Amino acid sequence: MGSVDASEKTITGWAARDATGHLSPYTYNLRRTGAEDVVLKVLYCGICHTDLHQTKNHLGASKYPMVPGHEVVGEVVEVGPEVSKYSVGDVVGVGVIVGCCRDCRPCKANVEQYCNKKIWSYNDVYTDGKPTQGGFAGSMVVDQKFVVKIPAGLAPEQAAPLLCAGVTVYSPLKHFGLMTPGLRGGILGLGGVGHMGVKVAKSMGHHVTVISSSDKKRAEAMDDLGADDYLVSSDEAQMAAAMDSLDYIIDTVPVKHPLEPYLALLKMDGKLVLMGVIGEPLSFVSPMVMLGRKTITGSFIGSIEETEEVLRFCVDKGLTSQIEVVKMDYLNQALERLERNDVRYRFVVDVAGSNIDDTAA
């Protein structure tokens, strides 16, 4: 174990204080280091669309002050006496959840992200009764079960988006048996998750169609990301010509939208996989699924096991996420740009390089 007791350490993070979502420096104490805990110095943290939802209370359950960030890469600086998986100096990652009951069916099946008692990386309450705070901060304390090793060959800033966006697209492709080469897949929405969907699906040997509401992303989808086709959803002729052509659609859109136009694109037995966090009901008429034995389903991030898999997959395939690295003092501007879809394709905050302790008020 390292010589610093994390329970005595006061750190600085950037927190939202209310539903305006504005972040500013905030000091707080790390929780006491448990026997199986890992203390990490945060190096980088990705910015996810969920951070917008949470900081602005779009889902109605936000608690303040809130330090967001759940795509966290850091260096281990201390370990509890029963930690066996990690050592001081390891570069590791932490994703969306930091706790679960370990006793329910999902936990026993190693899909702990579906545990009804899971503990979120931030905006939640830990087992000690204290609020969890995320990766827009100097340090974190996390149970070793919810920590993954960043493999050699993957830069830490590149690894950050894979801990949420990367595993979010990998998990349903694996679970629903959609990893077979030659499948025809659609990626609806070309943001942080969608761009990884294109890359992962292409690396599995799929024919990939990007679906977007306008033609403005065609060049980046096909020339930069390597998509095979581009479909403008507002063009009725294009949509009609593409009916019954796709084995699956990964729907990453995080706002309310119609489902029926996309169900029509699926072949018989095709799957529409919902991934966007949407706080309003979505609707469709039942014949749209009945007459093709189609499935509307959902998938939520991925397990710790799948996170480790997608990190190795990206190293093996030479995949990287397309990121814009920013400093901590750019956080609010980055969130504003994310809200208006002005990023290609993921912001990653250089936490360690931001000297955040100097900004504490």
Curated annotation (Swiss-Prot):
UniProt keyword annotations, A-Z: Lignin biosynthesis, Metal-binding, NADP, Oxidoreductase, Zinc
Cofactor: Zn(2+)
Naturally occurring in which organism (per UniProt): Lolium perenne (Perennial ryegrass)
A biological process from GO: lignin biosynthetic process
Pfam families named in the record: ADH_N, ADH_zinc_N
Claim: Oxidoreductase is one of the keywords in the record: yes
Residues the entry annotates as binding Zn(2+) 1: C48, H70, E71, C164
InterPro entries, A to Z: ADH-like_C, ADH-like_N, ADH_Zn_CS, CAD-like, GroES-like_sf, NAD(P)-bd_dom_sf, PKS_ER
Cysteines joined through disulfide linkages: none
GO molecular function: cinnamyl-alcohol dehydrogenase activity; coniferyl-alcohol dehydrogenase activity; zinc ion binding
Name this polypeptide is given: Probable cinnamyl alcohol dehydrogenase
Class of enzymatic activity (EC top level): oxidoreductase
